[in-house]
């Protein structure tokens, strides 16, 4: 189950609808073999992002996405570091009801960074959601996470294109 909570004003001008986010996250979770997992997404503004960043990480200022895992890693990489994982439909975690945790996405950061990186805002938002989801699933920063982020982007955009539900990819 995917729960999406929006703070006042956070959706203004945001490039993805709640439905788009749900479809993309369902595709990403399926690729991780976590189709039945629970994830909460909070779409927030820079002020709340900065508050959460300071309170939980001791850092000042807003950040793009924060991941708050509910428990220990559930889908930690199982391959050798030089072998990036692929979409796994046969994972032992498939179709379970694991609570992965909460993602807090700053919609302001999506707009700023998409301009800074020259990416369409909807693609940058998806990339940040993939990144945060991988943290919830037990991945740490590094080449394997980078590869897996791209894999999840392909899963999300391929699913969206096939179903013609999410537009703009």
From Swiss-Prot:
Record keyword Signal present: no
Cofactors that this protein relies on: Zn(2+)
Region (Disordered): 72-95
Cell compartments where the protein resides: Cytoplasm
Transmembrane annotation, as ranges: none
BP terms from Gene Ontology: rRNA processing
InterPro entries xrefs: MetalPrtase_cat_dom_sf_prd, YbeY, YbeY_CS
Domain of life: Bacteria
Keyword Cytoplasm: yes
Cofactor note: Binds 1 zinc ion.
Family that this chain belongs to: Belongs to the endoribonuclease YbeY family.
Name of this protein: Endoribonuclease YbeY
Protein's organism: Oleidesulfovibrio alaskensis (strain ATCC BAA-1058 / DSM 17464 / G20)
Lineage: Bacteria, Pseudomonadati, Thermodesulfobacteriota, Desulfovibrionia, Desulfovibrionales
Gene that encodes it: ybeY
